[in-house]
């Protein structure tokens, strides 16, 4: 890259076309990654039983008061992590069945497909896409718009531009989606109707203020913003080097796929400690939403939690799950960015063709 301005592919397409390209990429990425995560969850389910807990009536709108079985776990569709709260195995039975014993990942794929049908590998996908697709559309469109603004309107060029644009774009997407994810967790854990939702939100805001809607925002930002900054920095760098190596002015699908996988793997490894902390925080917040805030102590701060992990397990604790994260993140990034770039190229060629026909 150096001080060379990048080819402005996005200049020939509209923001709406960027949104369509990123939305398509988001759906395809989710279709590809979701089976991997469903299998992971099912393998975890046979090792970790649901825990017993008493649901405390700590809010006027929190109606569950009887002893109940709860389990909070993370579900990822390749774009976002979502907290799922299981209540007596009923609210997420398709995701968390444990009737069949699995000896490993491949065995789980075969048995789930054979016993429950192919569709069961995509259990839980539609509800998560409701937020994952808008978040991805905001994120990728904002990145292109910010990068082009810095490069072509402000006149800045250099390797730091993707770093800045990627971090700011992710910060904006996380800030918009974070309250919606908290609301979704409340609705799921408490079986709230839409008519009850505003009462729930007003009660939460009255007690803890408007910032309570962004509970869990900090750990998400600490993981996702550095990840995005590193991802776009490495992606643009690797893509430019591959284009130079193959002497092509515009990245092909293969080049975008390769650059996406490499940059995704690098960013995943470097931000793994924040991912470990964020996972723990999300589980704690999910349990708090399910059981009532009064019944559980407030979760530790991000830095305290990271320090405790370091004291208890050392660097191995902070880099736990290294291989599974890379295996999941690298292909997800590759599929998403290559589909997005392909979509942008398609719209660019379409717009150029229409412009020529209009002359």
UniProtKB/Swiss-Prot annotation:
User: Which reaction is the catalytic activity of this chain?
Assistant: glutathione(in) = glutathione(out)
Q: Which SUPFAM superfamilies match?
A: Mitochondrial carrier
Q: Name one GO cellular component term.
A: mitochondrial inner membrane
One annotated GO molecular function is: 2 iron, 2 sulfur cluster binding
Mitochondrial intermembrane side of the membrane: what ranges?
A: 1-18, 141-162, 234-253, 338-359
Q: Which residue ranges does the entry give as Mitochondrial matrix-facing topology?
A: 40-119, 184-212, 275-316
Give the record's free-text account of how this protein's activity is regulated.
Answer: The activity of SLC25A39 is regulated by levels of mitochondrial glutathione via its ability to bind [2Fe-2S] iron-sulfur cluster. Upon physiological levels of mitochondrial glutathione, glutathione prevents iron-sulfur-binding to SLC25A39 promoting cleavage and degradation by AFG3L2. Upon depletion of mitochondrial glutathione, SLC25A39 binds iron-sulfur, preventing cleavage and degradation by AFG3L2.
What is this protein's function? Mitochondrial transporter required for glutathione import into mitochondria. Glutathione, which plays key roles in oxidative metabolism, is produced exclusively in the cytosol and is imported in many organelles. Mitochondrial glutathione is required for the activity and stability of proteins containing iron-sulfur clusters, as well as erythropoiesis. Involved in the early steps of heme biosynthesis.
The protein in question is named Mitochondrial glutathione transporter SLC25A39
Q: Which organism is it from?
A: Danio rerio (Zebrafish)
Underlying gene: slc25a39
